[in-house]
């Protein structure tokens, strides 16, 4: 069975499932480039990245030098090395870009950022059965067939109209795209391809996923821009399973 994820993100579902093959996509080209480099050049990558995880690099001056280098670099390998450093040393683990496509997360001021060497090797081993593509969710899902299962973990819909959200990439995910994702899922399940979507449990998401079988789980999430406020919120799992979905609205 082929597992397809149009929003691979950090890859936690990929790393904790056991399918024979994976097709994993994301709109963030830096992320996909890193994954492909870790997959193909594991030892070289780990050695280069380890050199940045030293006490001398854990200061604002060096961080901003590396951030500037990352934004100017055209070398995929060097960018991938710096991308991991910026993710670990940047504020709150954010991945954020300005409208010019420049990484703009400030320095995080952590005592000793963790170098994930064992996790990189585990990822590389698991990735031998995976293919990574930089593409939109629509393009990724368009290639799904009846040998696939599709899991979608999109940027979550706001919990309220005043919720403070920052763009994961320069292409922020709009409410129209959220609704479009649900329409694509409906089209796939009508072709006997199962789809699971996770999102916040709101009136809007319930409207979007009204043809799906809905399950509610409680998860602990940061609910402020500084990451300091955490509480349990309801998360919605919308399962589009052939033979189970509600009929389309007339």
Language-model features, listed with the residues they occupy:
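Conserved SAM-binding loop of SAM-dependent methyltransferases across substrates and taxa
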Residues: 10-21
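Conserved acidic-Pro-Pro-aromatic motif
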Residues: 146-234
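Flexible, glycine-/basic-rich loop-and-beta segments that form/coincide
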Residues: 242-250
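SAM-dependent nucleic-acid methyltransferase catalytic core
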Residues: 39-166, 180, 187-191, 233
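Short alpha-helix immediately C-terminal to the canonical SAM-binding loop
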Residues: 32
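Short, small-residue-biased leader/transition segments that mark boundaries at the very start
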Residues: 1-2
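Class I SAM-dependent methyltransferase core
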Residues: 5-7
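Conserved SAM/SAH-binding beta-strand->alpha-helix loop
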Residues: 28
């Amino acid at each position: 069975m082929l597992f397809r994820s149009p929003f691979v993100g950090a890859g936690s579902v990929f790393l904790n499932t056991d399918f024979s093959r994976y097709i994993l996509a994301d709109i963030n080209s830096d992320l996909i480039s890193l994954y492909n480099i870790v997959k193909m050049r594991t030892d070289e990558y780990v050695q280069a990245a380890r050199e940045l995880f030293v006490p001398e690099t854990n200061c604002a001056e060096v961080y901003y030098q590396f951030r500037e280098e990352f934004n100017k670099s055209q070398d995929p390998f060097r960018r991938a090395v710096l991308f991991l450093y910026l993710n670990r040393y940047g504020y709150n683990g954010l991945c954020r870009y300005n409208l010019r496509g420049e990484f703009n997360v400030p320095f995080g001021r952590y005592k000793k950022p963790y170098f994930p060497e064992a996790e990189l090797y585990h990822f590389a081993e698991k990735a031998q059965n995976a293919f990574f593509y930089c593409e939109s969710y629509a393009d990724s899902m368009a290639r799904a067939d009846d040998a696939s299962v599709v899991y979608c973990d999109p940027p979550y819909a706001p919990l309220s109209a005043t919720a403070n959200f920052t763009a994961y990439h320069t292409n922020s995910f709009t409410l129209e795209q959220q609704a479009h994702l649900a329409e694509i899922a409906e089209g796939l399940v009508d072709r006997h391809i199962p789809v699971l979507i996770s999102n916040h449990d709101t009136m809007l998401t319930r409207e979007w996923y009204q043809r799906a079988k809905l399950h509610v789980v409680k998860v602990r999430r940061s609910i402020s821009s500084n990451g300091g406020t955490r509480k349990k919120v309801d998360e919605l799992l919308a399962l589009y399973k052939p033979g189970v979905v509600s009929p389309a609205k007339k």
